[in-house]
């Protein structure tokens, strides 16, 4: 067998030419111990705080505790398949999620992976989950209304675009229902409104039952609201790190719209469960516990999340991100640690009460304890004109109602006040899934504060309202359109509205 030198050298040259010049360098560590969703890893000397690391089998984790001799890693997934001595790789990337309009209409987990079975998400952009909130200079004070469609809120506790309004109450008081109705109320704007007014919705479910989240998504889908919404779900069966991360992931998705000159609304449901998940992680990482065994930085956990909701000024695109965080209280105790923290961070709270809920006053908003620190700058002029007096009348009614229990012989003025108050309270009730446009709310409240309900029996108020709205929508469209376009009750509009209500009141009697 003759060996041709030229041939061998040609083959060798060819092989050398194709030889991979780049060796893959990856910094690795070893698992020292693992359990309860936490791994202690030796090595990984240059790992960054919050960096993603990879375990065998594609399981991911996040480096949270950087200690002198090891790294504490929280695991996003089951820790059953991870054992002592396993090799852990750095990925070099801080935790990020896909963002953009491609996510609208989808249900994703805390890392942005789709969990709705509708195929992969082809997002063009990714963002870090934990970024710094906008500073003072890029912001602008809140001045545009974010309409919820609920009379009790839009009239008395108005929420503006870029505001953070806490929804707080015991379990089963209708907190999620307020967020759901607010999402549904954006449908008319998405169908017919200008692009600049459209409000994209993000719902973050933390530690909830899967059936509850499925029900929420089903309602959005049936009512055509899923097409402008994103649902981020970290349910009760998900690991604590996912429940901790979900609000930050949802916030990053909402910030995409805020930073592109659009408007977004995010509901965190609920932050009490996020705090519990964070407490679990912190205690397992052996961080020192503080009040109620929460770690010392649980205030910072919520403040850095909620500070990212902002209204940006015109130089920065004039976008906004409005936050509706939810907190669940135990036995109406708003003085517990997490509720007081979040109340002090947010720009007001909507306080829901169990006994109001069981009295049939739904939404069960306690108007006396609820406030909006942005106030009437988040209302259109027409709403300010009619809602100004309803606040005062309801406050007087609550005060009088407390005294009226003792005395039987009340003077006529007090009796009148109590009658009016009872009817206004009835007027502010609203069934679920039936949000009203702002101009319709203005018309209804105008009828209430101008004495049209005083002669009616309390149980007739709802019927009167339904009939009045039906009459306005069919025969007096021009009045509603006028309020919508003018955004104020001019003398001319007031006269038209008064005539329309007078005509209806005659036929109703």
Curated annotation (Swiss-Prot):
Which gene is annotated as encoding this protein in its UniProt record?
atpA
| EC number(s) stated in the UniProt entry for this protein | 7.1.2.2
Matching CDD domains: ATP-synt_F1_alpha_C, ATP-synt_F1_alpha_N, F1-ATPase_alpha_CD
Alphabetized Gene3D superfamilies for the sequence: 2.40.30.20, ATP synthase alpha/beta chain, C-terminal domain, P-loop containing nucleotide triphosphate hydrolases
- Membrane association type: Peripheral membrane protein
Q: Where is it mainly found?
A: membrane
- The record places the site described as Required for activity at 370
- Supply the Pfam families for this chain: ATP-synt_ab (PF00006), ATP-synt_ab_C (PF00306), ATP-synt_ab_N (PF02874)
Q: Which positions bind ATP?
A: 169-176
| Record family assignment | Belongs to the ATPase alpha/beta chains family.
Q: Could you identify this protein by its name?
A: ATP synthase subunit alpha
Task: Give the keywords, sorted.
Answer: ATP synthesis, ATP-binding, Cell inner membrane, Cell membrane, CF(1), Hydrogen ion transport, Ion transport, Membrane, Nucleotide-binding, Translocase, Transport
Q: What is the lineage of its organism?
A: Bacteria, Pseudomonadati, Pseudomonadota, Alphaproteobacteria, Hyphomicrobiales
Catalysed reaction, written as an equation: ATP + H2O + 4 H(+)(in) = ADP + phosphate + 5 H(+)(out)
